[in-house]
Amino acid sequence: MLREIRKVAVLGAGTMGARIAVHLANASIPALLLDIVPREVPPEEQAKGLTLDHLQVRNRLAMAGLEAALKSRPAAFFVPEAARMITVGNFEDNLAWIKDCDWIIEAVTEDRNIKRVLLEKAQALLAPGAIVSTNTSGISIASIAEGFREEFRRHWLGTHFFNPPRYMKLLEVIPTADTLPEVVEAVSRFGDEALGKGIVLAKDTPNFIANRIGTFVTLDVLGMAGPDGQQGGYTIEEIDALTGPAMGLPKSATFRTLDIVGIDVLVHVVKNLEASLPHDERRDLFRIPDFITRMIERKLLGEKTGQGFYKKVKGGDEGEILTLDLQTFEYRARQKPKLPALEMAKNVEDARQRVTALLQSPERAGEFYRKVLGDAFHYAANRIPEISDDIVSIDNAMKWGFNWESGVFELWDAVGVEKIAEQWKKEKRPIPPLAEKLLTSSKKAFYQQSDGLTRYFDLRSGDYRALEQGPGVILLPSLKARKREIKKNPGASLIDLGDGVACLEFHSKMNSIGADTVQMAHAGLKALNEGFDAMVIGNQAANFCVGANLMLLLVAIQEGEWDDVHQAVRAFQSANMALKYAPKPVVAAPFGLTLGGGVEICLHSARVRAAAETYMGLVEVGVGLIPAAGGTKEMLVRAMDAAPRDEGADPFALVKEVFQNIGMARVSTSAEEARRLGYLSARDSISMNRDRLIADAKQLALDLVKLGFRPGKPRDDIQVLGQSAFAKMKLGLHLMRRAEFISDYDVVVGTHLAKVLSGGGEFTSPQRVSEQYLLDLEREAFVSLCGQRKTVERIQHMLKKGKPLRN
C-alpha cells in the first residue's frame, strides 16, 4: 500500500539536491537533506578544535548546500524562515532517518555506480510503500535499479526536476517497466498539486524529452555560429537576437543561457547523448563544436568562471559586457545585429505570427529560421513514439523546461505543416511518419480547437484525441469559447464559472486598470445582486495586473482635465469599496506581477487566493504618486487593527512599516513574502500551481458561501495618530535625504504619503476617522502630485523605459 507523501528525504546536497529540498520546504513539506561525510577537516575547522567526529564537520556538505540555497539569487526560498522545514544530516550517521519518509529523492553526482551503492544501502531502510526516485538527467532509470529487490523496483522511477526547481515548471516523471501505475499517479499528483509542477510522462530514453529536443536545437544553432558555421556564419549577437523573444524564447536566448547553465554542463549532456544514441538519424549533430572544446580548454565556462560567451568588465555605472569573438577568441565590444527583418517583426506581438513572418523573409533571419525550425520540426516528429507517445508531452516539455512560448508542434501548426512538408519533398528529405500520417488523413494541423476543447493528433490512432484537463483546472478561454462570457468590453469580461460563481477577467494591455475595468467590476457586483453567489477576480495572462493605465492618466494631465482625473480616482475608489462590502464573497486570484491598482483590488476583496509566485507591491511612488484607490487607506487599516491594545502601547511602529513598504515601493518575491509585507492577510491562502488558481479561488468563494458569508459595514473607527506620527515620518524622510538614499522629490512624494497615513497631519492627538475620510485624503494627495512636473517626468519615463526615474 502506498504511503501518503508527508515527509521527503533528498539524498545529495549539491545544487539540485539542495534546491529540491528547498522547494519541498516552500510547499510546507518537511524534508531531510543528506550528503556524504567530508574526508578531511580544513584548516579553519581545525583552528576551532573540530575533528571528523564533530557534527558540524560531518554535516558540513549538507549544511553548505542549504546555506548556498539561502544566499542564492533569485531566491530559492519563498521566505528564509522556510529553512526550518529542512533537517540536514549525512549518509553515515543519518541514512536510517529515511525510514520515516514517504518519498526518497536521490540527487547525488551523475555516476551510475555511486547512485547504485547509495540506493543499495537505502533499500534496506525503507518503510513499506515508500517511493524512491532519481533526479538523474540522463542515466537510464531502469539500469540504476537493475538487480534490486522487486518491491524496490515497483516503487522506483525517475523524477527529473529542472533548475532552479522553484522557478522551472517542468517535472519529467519517468517510470520503468516495473513501476506500479499507482506510484506514477501518486508522484504526478503530488508534483502537480503540492509542488506546482507541470507533469510530463517521459520514456526511459537518453536525456528523456526536454533535454533531448532542447540539446538538439542548441547544437543545431551552435552549428550556425562563427566563421565556420552553416548558412553564412552568424555572430553570437545575431544568434541571441534570433533565438530570444523574437522566436518566443527567453531573453537569455542561446549563448546567455549557456553561460548561466555552464559550458561544461552542455559538454556533459552532449557526450552522454553521443554515447547513448548510436542509431539516432542525427547522431552527427551530437558532437562538441570545436569552439566549445577551445572554451573548455581555456576555462571559459560561463558565469561560474566569470567569462564564457560573454564577459562583464568594470567600467561606467553598471560595467560593460563584452562578447567572445569566435574567430580570434578575444573579447570585443558587443555589436548590434543588422537584421532588418527582425526589426520589422518586433511589431508583431504574437510569437507564432512573428515566426511565420520571419520564415518567409529572404534575408539572413529567414535563412536561419528555415534551417533551425525545419530541423527542429523534423527531429521532434521522428522522436514519436521513441521518447513520448504524444506531441503534447514534447510541446509541454519545451514550454515548461526551456520556457518556450509555444511548443515545437504548436509552432509547426502556425507555420503550416503542409507547407514545411512540401519544402522537404523538394529537398528530397524524408517526411517523418507522424507528419506523413497526419497529411494522408486529410488533416492540416497537429492541434484542433472546437467547442472550447483542444484536440491533438495521435499517431497510433491516426485521429484527433481530446486533450483532457485534469480536475481542478479551469481554462477561461475554453469557457468563453463555450459561450460562457456574460459581458465584455475592451478591457475586461464577466464569465460564468459555473456553480453560481462569476469571474471578472482583465484583458487590457498588460492588464492595466482603466475605466473599462472599473465598469466591468460594477457589472460583476450587479451580477451578484441578480443571481450569482460569489465572484472571482482573475485572469490567465502573463501577469495579474501591472496597475493603473498610466497612458490615460498622462493624457488627462497634459490636457489639464483635472475633473477627469478626480473622477477616475473616485470611480476606482468607489469600485473597490463596493467590492469590499459586496453582499456576497469576492475572491481575488493574483499571480505574477500584481502591482499598484492590482494590489488595491486584492486588498478590498473578501479573500485572496494567490499563486505562490505572486510579486505584489504598491509601487506608485516610482511614478511620483501614492496609492489612491484605497491602497494607502487599507494598509493603514490593517496596521491599526493589528496594533497592540495594551495601555500605553505605541502603534507607530506598524504605521512606520506601512510607510516604508509603500514609500520604498517594496515588491514581494513570493506570495508568502507578500503576507509578511501586509499585502496578504492571515486569512488569505496560496496555490502552488498557477494552473489551478482559478479553480482554487472558485472553491474558496463557494466555501465562504457555505459558511454563511456576511459583509461588513464601512468603517468609521480607524485610529490615526496625527501630528506626532506625521513629524516622525517627515524626520525619517529628512534623514534619508541627508544620507542621499532618496531625492528631493522623493521627499515631496513621501510627505504626501505621510500626511495620509497620519490622518491629514493636523490632529494634535490620535483620532478616529472613517474610511471615506482617508479616501478623500488619498485622492487629494494623488491629484496634487499629478500637477507636479517631476511626477509627469516619472510617468513619461516609466511609459518609455519601463523602469522608474529617480529625479
Give the predicted meaning of each segment.
Residues 546-548:
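Extended, composition-driven regions rather than compact fold-specific motifs
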Residues 1-535, 539-542, 551-571, 575-584, ...:
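N-terminal glycine-rich phosphate-binding loop for ADP-containing cofactors
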Residues 600:
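Short alpha-helical segment that forms part of, or immediately flanks, the ligand-binding pocket
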